[in-house]
Amino acid sequence: MRKYLLLIFFALFSFSATNAEIRWKLSDDGTLTISGTDMPDYRIFYDTNTGQTIAPWYSEREKIKKIVIENGVTGIGQEAFTYCVSLTSITIPNSVTSIGKFAFKGCSELESITILNSVTSIGEGTFYNCYALTSVTIPNSVTSIGQEAFTHCESLTSITIPNSVTSIGDWAFGGCLSLTSVTIPNSVTSIGESAFDGCKSLTSITIPNSVTRIEDTVFSGCSGLTSITIPNSVTSIGSIAFYDCSVLESITIPNSVTSIERYAFSDCSGLTSIIVEEGNAKYDSRDNCNAIIETKSNTLIAGCKNAVIPNTVTSIGHGAFDGCDSLTTITIPNSVTSIGEGAFKGCESLTSVTIPNSVTSIGDYAFYDCSVLESITIPNSVTSIGEGVFFNCYALTSITFEGSTPPRFEEDVFKDVNKSIPVYVPANSIEAYKKALGDYFPETSIRALQH
């Protein structure tokens, strides 16, 4: 039967145009031996554009425990060993110079692998979902680590990246739950989006001074990260870059940074210190405020539980205190005219907030999920309240509106707020507020404000 399969394989996969020829044999002990020269790329599903089809041993993949690639084979094809779920070891000769996309995807029992210094790149998704992989040796011949190369290698505890590597792709180590340490050399100039997303055991990381941008979501979900060093080579920090780094205690923004995108430090609930270095032309942390302020616009873009909003700030930016769940109270100075989208979203310990009479607009979801906020007073200066502003503020016991004209309400402003709580409004505006708030509160809840 095995000879018959081999004959079929030679008939289908002999590429005389390129002299490509691969021979394979699967022994009774589960050893797959591969010899020849150039291994083609494969696909789990037939690709009508390229003619690529599944590897000839794919139907036997669950029997494969060990792979021996003999010297002379120059490359490992795309998806060559995908879902070989019983594979525990592999021998790669130094004749191999390339490893194709998703070559070992889903090899969930593979524990260790040594990549020889003949290989120059680790391709996209090479070890994706290799859950048992605890050890991998990357040689100094490798210049790039592709996107998703080690995604969800949940047992991988440490990784040393050689100084030959210049780029780390998107999601390269995303979901490596056990990764506690990683060494990134100065040769690396780019680290892709979500490269370390969800590395919950990673406690510290130093970004080399060869990197100029911290990409979107790159350290998102690194909930064990206590310290991070941002070099003064960095000029921009992407959106949600440090989202949910919940035990990160301090952050220093070097004077080289000229761009910080929205929600960069959202849900960093453990932050107690935020400092912008002196001499930064774009941002400052004036008056030791423990916040990042965009200097020209006087917009506070990121704060922490110890932040004090200076009275020179005119707006609170998008997600400025998002997820700051240790914040219990905040005073907004009367210099502020707008509260941005999601500004205090998820501040689950916030019991009180004073909105000054200078504020004219409150952005979408500004106080969403402030689940212990007890009361709120909307001053007569406010003309618009965005979508879902008090959504899930189910601890509210009263709401007060001081304006004689109701502000413009977007959808779901008071969704999941107790409908029976009193809503106090100016006596001569009761009917107007009954109409404006009819979707949220019964008419009996709208009451005259007592002065």
Name every feature range the model reports, one short phrase each.
Residues 57, 77-82, 100-105, 123-128, ...:
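Consensus positions within tandem repeat domains that build extended binding/scaffold surfaces
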Residues 30-37, 62-75, 85-98, 108-121, ...:
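Structural signature of tandem-repeat unit edges
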Residues 4-13:
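Sec-dependent N-terminal signal peptides
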Residues 52-55, 302, 409-412:
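A generic local structural motif
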Residues 21-85, 102, 171, 220, ...:
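Surface-exposed repetitive/solenoidal architectures
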Residues 15-20:
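Sec/Tat signal peptide C-region and signal peptidase I cleavage site
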Residues 13, 44-45, 413:
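Short, aromatic- and cysteine-enriched interfacial helices/patches
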